[in-house]
Amino acid sequence: MKNSVKQHASALTAVLACLALALVLYHSLAGGTLLQSSPYNSYALQAENWLAGRNNIANGENYTWLELAIYQGRYYQSFPPVPAVLMLPFVAAAGEWSAIPGNLIAMGLALLCAGGVYACCMRGGMQPVTCAFFTLFVSMGSNVFWMSTNDGVWFLAQVCALGFAFWGLFFAQGGNAVQDAAASLCMALAVGCRPFYALLLACWLGWQFYQRRSLKRILPALLPAVVMAACMMAYNFARFGSVTEFGHNYLPEFVRAENGQFSLTYLVPNLLQLLRPVTLDAQGQLHFEIYNGFLFFAANPLFLLAMVRGLLLRLPGHQAEVQVSVPLPSAGWFVAAMCLLMTCLTCMHRTLGGWQFGARYMVDLFPWLFVWFLGRPKWRPDSSAWALCGAAMLFNLYGALYMLNT
């Protein structure tokens, strides 16, 4: 037991050190930007206004580059509020929103997210090498790496949500009331960063009720989520008179849009954008789209790994992987259905994330992939899996640097 703990501690330390080094090197190449802050961190701006006793953004008309909602003549931060809460101590210490070391904070959140991935895999019974593999794949071999380089509002929302989701899955495997409550709180906080994580929370709560057949027995799992939902609904109502509106519908771009923020008319065009290829010309130059993304598994090959593993299990004569019980249904068909549903819901949004490298919205599906991975913890990465992970890290390092000049 002591030896196992030591091995896990060593592997986790090594992985976090690699991620920290990669981010420090990136910011060095970017011109020494680690301690700087992005002008797009409207969470910090909201925190500054909270500290001044306002739930709106004072002089919002001066921040023309930010995605601010306009409602009854006032300007409001238009994203769910949880990351803004995290900014409060930093803004209070710095004195103003633009003075915080935003990129360093983003790096810290990325390390916490990576720690959540490792802890989730470790509690699921995976070996240290497998835990390290998946942590590297998520933190450096996907769009998560590029989003970890900047404290812009969009990136903070996704990295925070993903981190909360993985820590939620970690606690959900604990099997007692205290850890059920912690899992519920973490997943609810993820919803407070990215609303589509409500699907993960709802499925987990539903699965707990199905297994325990008693509302009383799932109260520890239910209460934190209910309290968090009530707080966020009250905050929405105080600002917009609606418990479900956090501001995006009042963004000028969606007010002007013929079909609004969400519509079925966006579904097929956006799905096709997730299939746009990355090509190589005769001079060896890569070509890809940087608006609304490209082929979803090119920058996020974790999907490719899951698909290949799933297909191999269907081949005749292939040895089945040992399955274990996890806090959510881990059948391949169920996980695939949830990923498809999440993708369709995402593609019903007017945009797919705008300016970007890869397909960053697809990162929101990672917890579902890990539900499947956690159900099969005895698998260990072979040389081909490590090669895929290495290629993914190189491609995403390239992408992060490429976007510096775009």
Feature-to-residue mapping (PLM):
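Membrane-proximal envelope and lipid/glycan-remodeling enzymes
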Residues: 1-406
